[in-house]
Amino acid sequence: MAGKKSPRKSTINHSTHSGKLPANIKRLIKKGESDTKSRQSPPTLSTTRPRRFSLIYSSESSLSDVSDSDKNKSTNPHKIKRKAKNISNNSQGKKSKLIQRQIDNDDEGTESSDYQAVTDGEESENEEEESEEEEEDDDEDDDDDDDDGSDSDSDSETSSDDENIDFVKLTAQRKKRAMKALSAMNTNSNTLYSSRENSNKNKSVKLSPKKENEEEQKEEKEKEKEEQQKQQESNKKEVNGSGTTTTQQALSFKFKKEDDGISFGNGNEGYNEDIGEEVLDLKNKENNGNEEDKLDSKVMLGNNDELRFPNISESDESEYDIDQDAYFDVINNEDSHGEIGTDLETGEDDLPILEEEEQNIVSELQNDDELSFDGSIHEEGSDPVEDAENKFLQNEYNQENGYDEEDDEEDEIMSDFDMPFYEDPKFANLYYYGDGSEPKLSLSTSLPLMLNDEKLSKLKKKEAKKREQEERKQRRKLYKKTQKPSTRTTSNVDNDEYIFNVFFQSDDENSGHKSKKGRHKSGKSHIEHKNKGSNLIKSNDDLEPSTHSTVLNSGKYDSSDDEYDNILLDVAHMPSDDECSESETSHDADTDEELRALDSDSLDIGTELDDDYEDDDDDSSVTNVFIDIDDLDPDSFYFHYDSDGSSSLISSNSDKENSDGSKDCKHDLLETVVYVDDESTDEDDNLPPPSSRSKNIGSKAKEIVSSNVVGLRPPKLGTWETDNKPFSIIDGLSTKSLYALIQEHQQLREQHQRAQTPDVKREGSSNGNNGDELTLNELLNMSELEDDSPSHTDDMENNYNDAINSKSTNGHAADWYEVPKVPLSAFRNKGINAYEEDEYMIPANSNRKVPIGYIGNERTRKKIDKMKELQRKKTEKKRQLKKKKKLLKIRKQRQKAIKEQETMNLQLGINGHEIIGNNNSHSDINTGTDFTTNENTPMNELPSHAPEDASLIPHNSDLAVDSNTRKNSTKSVGLDEIHEILGKDENDLLSVGDINGYDAQEGHVIEDTDADILASLTAPVQFDNTLSHENSNSMWRRRQSMVEAAAENLRFTKNGLFSESALADIEGIMGNDVNHSFEFNDVLQ
């Protein structure tokens, strides 16, 4: 609200007076400046207004003379008029009592604050009137003293009266005096200070209302009057001489807020007060009131419109602290008029306008539909349509949930709307709770969201409870069908032990506490404990109405605590007390009976509750107590207790079957390893079960020899049988012997004898009786060359009955490969029974060469060989297809070249070449024939080479093999075949379609492989420079090199030494034309 002040309280009764400042402040300032010459000029307002201090202390001590307030009421009309004026405009400050900060004497300030008391409003009003009258009485006493002499006077007067001080009343009077600090508003700083000193002297004399000290006090007061008159006259002269300067000086004071007290800035900080210095006596005021009222009335009547303010010494009121309790009590109980505000305050004339504006704003807020304070529409207004809907829905809601009128009142307090927001027909377009099929409207200021998070959570909880209730009913129906009704046995557990029994079970508890089965009608306390158990699980019990507790405690439904305990344990899959105490033989039957009894009892309770309160969403009965299994026993989902220690409670047959299956699996997995040998010691429990291990440990372990050596069998770790020999585990799989030392020495001697003369009969006997096995020492110390002796190898060959060549029978395998025998390991090829299957050894003396590192038995080797054979055939077929395509390409190129050669018949008749004149396609010229022989020369007339050249090539029957084998395609060709191919004419070659045919005229059959070789050797060459002698010589050298390569039993490769492209490049480097060369590499690609 504009123009309003902060809501702080004051002690002024605003029913009759206004606490605002006057609006005509400038006029008061001018009047104050004009009237300073004719009278004592109090300080007036200047351009900057003083900050008004609003600390109020309106309580009066119960230890002071309250009866004096009636006597101090003045009938002077001037006093009443001035009092009303001061209250209405606050021109002289508030008639409140200030407690200032103590600076020099902290002990007295804390002592005075301990005895402060707060009274009711009537005492505060009486004290306000007293303070106003005291102010008038003090005005006459404020004319006597200066600031310089005030300290010594007060010290001398009060210190002499210490023996007459009543400290209880002194503290109360000090509080009254502290609150009266701002009442002296009519004089300047000197007059105010001197009047306060004089009043202090009067008060210090009257320390107690006893009549014994009255005579002494009267004598002191007469002296004070004389001093006050002298001070008044001197002060008037000083004020008349410097009126304006005094006003500016008085207005220059500053408030200092320190800790709990507020002090002024122009005080004498080095001043120390004595005890009882500022005790106020209202009786003395009445006695001396006549003379003081005259001077006071002269000042006040002439300067009624001026604003007066205090300039209080800081040291004068420095020992008083604010009573915080009284201060905040006054603030909370009074109105906020006349308090400290900003510099721009409103006067009396502005109040009606501000009140009218406030009413208009409030009415707009009440009538505005679009504004809401807590998210609801019409917070204070009423909508007839809404009221009707609320009534209808409220009645319907009460009928469904069974609420009474008290619950309705609670619901009205808790929420503004009793029906969900999405069911309101006014907001049917807003699908806040829709399933997403309808488009949702965005929220706006005209349609605020009416449901907060609390309401949403309530709705979700209600829906969840409904679903859980339905599921529970279905479970009960299924359980009734599966289980047979039988009697139940429950333990009689005390109510105090309920919480203990939920978490702890004792073995002896169930044996002595068996009780009868049945339903107890006096089960009120049991259900109460069930509610306690539900409070442990459910966190929303405080939101439930009070009706449910009456429903639960009605005694209509009852059960026992042990039953509820077992229900909890049943859901959590934990063993109950009943099962822990029973034996294993009778455990299953008793558990089944108890389960059926528990579930039947819970079924009866649940059906009754469901029939009576079917639609009750907030029902907290046993049927609505749902337990999170993971909260009670997190490990129950993974672990089920075995029958030996404690058995798990299973509520259905399917759970039992699952648990039995899991137990069987667990026994299978944790089956103990049993060795055949009964004398075995130090069994390692960490070993895998025997099913995962092979029969002979280490039978598949292989040692890889260097691949540089071909034909050596890979070594193998030795194996042992543990039937008759004791052994112990070293590192899981390796063993050590446990024979005696004497037996070991005997075995060592036998070992040395075997090294010199190996005994083969030992191996033959070991197969029969499995005795006399190798020990660890024997394996470590045996000779590596034992297998290399001729007799031993001969015996091994006779045992295997394999066909082996003469070199291997003589035992010269190492000599053949010329590789020294290096011992690799003490376990290599030792401890192997030679009479076992072939898969335990790789046949080193068989015809088949096994590559280094080849692992597997004969069966796997055969499979791998078949796979390799199929792969080789596939690659061979692909290679043949590529060659056939290249041959066709070559023939096409040759036919093209023949057509070009027909135009050059005259130039090509050199060196015995006869030109065939016919134009048919068979008159081709073989440009690759030998220059020394005619192309028509028969093969038997070809020059024969040295026999030693042909003897290097073995004449096998593999030369004319089918094209499916790779050997024939890569086999070297002898000189005779080359001369035969080179001496033949083109007409002698068979066509591709007649490979297996026979030419009767020539008497030769050309195979497919020979045709491939022929095509590669007789590759076409460009004939641009055929007549040149150098070209012919290079062609001859090329052909002669091919013949030499074939004579030396070297293979032709597509990127080898004798490729056409390499030789052509060499010829180009030597000076010949590069175009003359034929790219032989491209042909074989």
UniProtKB/Swiss-Prot annotation:
<feature type="region of interest" description="Disordered">
    <location>
        <begin position="676"/>
        <end position="700"/>
    </location>
</feature>
<feature type="compositionally biased region" description="Polar residues">
    <location>
        <begin position="9"/>
        <end position="18"/>
    </location>
</feature>
<dbReference type="GO" id="GO:0042790">
    <property type="term" value="P:nucleolar large rRNA transcription by RNA polymerase I"/>
</dbReference>
<dbReference type="GO" id="GO:0060963">
    <property type="term" value="P:positive regulation of ribosomal protein gene transcription by RNA polymerase II"/>
</dbReference>
<feature type="compositionally biased region" description="Polar residues">
    <location>
        <begin position="241"/>
        <end position="251"/>
    </location>
</feature>
<dbReference type="GO" id="GO:0003712">
    <property type="term" value="F:transcription coregulator activity"/>
</dbReference>
<feature type="modified residue" description="Phosphoserine">
    <location>
        <position position="1041"/>
    </location>
</feature>
<feature type="region of interest" description="Disordered">
    <location>
        <begin position="1"/>
        <end position="251"/>
    </location>
</feature>
<dbReference type="GO" id="GO:0005634">
    <property type="term" value="C:nucleus"/>
</dbReference>
<feature type="compositionally biased region" description="Low complexity">
    <location>
        <begin position="54"/>
        <end position="66"/>
    </location>
</feature>
<feature type="compositionally biased region" description="Basic and acidic residues">
    <location>
        <begin position="747"/>
        <end position="764"/>
    </location>
</feature>
<feature type="compositionally biased region" description="Acidic residues">
    <location>
        <begin position="676"/>
        <end position="686"/>
    </location>
</feature>
<dbReference type="GO" id="GO:0032545">
    <property type="term" value="C:CURI complex"/>
</dbReference>
<feature type="compositionally biased region" description="Polar residues">
    <location>
        <begin position="484"/>
        <end position="493"/>
    </location>
</feature>
<dbReference type="GO" id="GO:0003713">
    <property type="term" value="F:transcription coactivator activity"/>
</dbReference>
<feature type="compositionally biased region" description="Basic and acidic residues">
    <location>
        <begin position="209"/>
        <end position="239"/>
    </location>
</feature>
<protein>
    <recommendedName>
        <fullName>Protein IFH1</fullName>
    </recommendedName>
</protein>
<feature type="compositionally biased region" description="Basic residues">
    <location>
        <begin position="76"/>
        <end position="85"/>
    </location>
</feature>
<feature type="compositionally biased region" description="Basic and acidic residues">
    <location>
        <begin position="584"/>
        <end position="599"/>
    </location>
</feature>
<comment type="similarity">
    <text>Belongs to the IFH1 family.</text>
</comment>
<feature type="region of interest" description="Disordered">
    <location>
        <begin position="283"/>
        <end position="302"/>
    </location>
</feature>
<dbReference type="GO" id="GO:0000785">
    <property type="term" value="C:chromatin"/>
</dbReference>
<feature type="region of interest" description="Disordered">
    <location>
        <begin position="457"/>
        <end position="493"/>
    </location>
</feature>
<comment type="function">
    <text>Transcriptional coactivator that together with FHL1 regulates the expression of rRNA and ribosomal protein genes. Its activity is negatively regulated by environmental stress.</text>
</comment>
<feature type="compositionally biased region" description="Basic residues">
    <location>
        <begin position="474"/>
        <end position="483"/>
    </location>
</feature>
<dbReference type="GO" id="GO:0006357">
    <property type="term" value="P:regulation of transcription by RNA polymerase II"/>
</dbReference>
<feature type="modified residue" description="Phosphoserine">
    <location>
        <position position="208"/>
    </location>
</feature>
<keyword id="KW-0804">Transcription</keyword>
<dbReference type="GO" id="GO:0060962">
    <property type="term" value="P:regulation of ribosomal protein gene transcription by RNA polymerase II"/>
</dbReference>
<feature type="region of interest" description="Disordered">
    <location>
        <begin position="747"/>
        <end position="774"/>
    </location>
</feature>
<keyword id="KW-0539">Nucleus</keyword>
<feature type="compositionally biased region" description="Polar residues">
    <location>
        <begin position="546"/>
        <end position="557"/>
    </location>
</feature>
<dbReference type="Pfam" id="PF10380">
    <property type="entry name" value="CRF1"/>
</dbReference>
<keyword id="KW-0597">Phosphoprotein</keyword>
<feature type="region of interest" description="Disordered">
    <location>
        <begin position="507"/>
        <end position="622"/>
    </location>
</feature>
<feature type="compositionally biased region" description="Polar residues">
    <location>
        <begin position="184"/>
        <end position="197"/>
    </location>
</feature>
<dbReference type="GO" id="GO:0000781">
    <property type="term" value="C:chromosome, telomeric region"/>
</dbReference>
<feature type="compositionally biased region" description="Acidic residues">
    <location>
        <begin position="607"/>
        <end position="620"/>
    </location>
</feature>
<feature type="compositionally biased region" description="Basic residues">
    <location>
        <begin position="513"/>
        <end position="524"/>
    </location>
</feature>
<feature type="compositionally biased region" description="Acidic residues">
    <location>
        <begin position="120"/>
        <end position="165"/>
    </location>
</feature>
<keyword id="KW-0805">Transcription regulation</keyword>
<feature type="compositionally biased region" description="Polar residues">
    <location>
        <begin position="39"/>
        <end position="48"/>
    </location>
</feature>
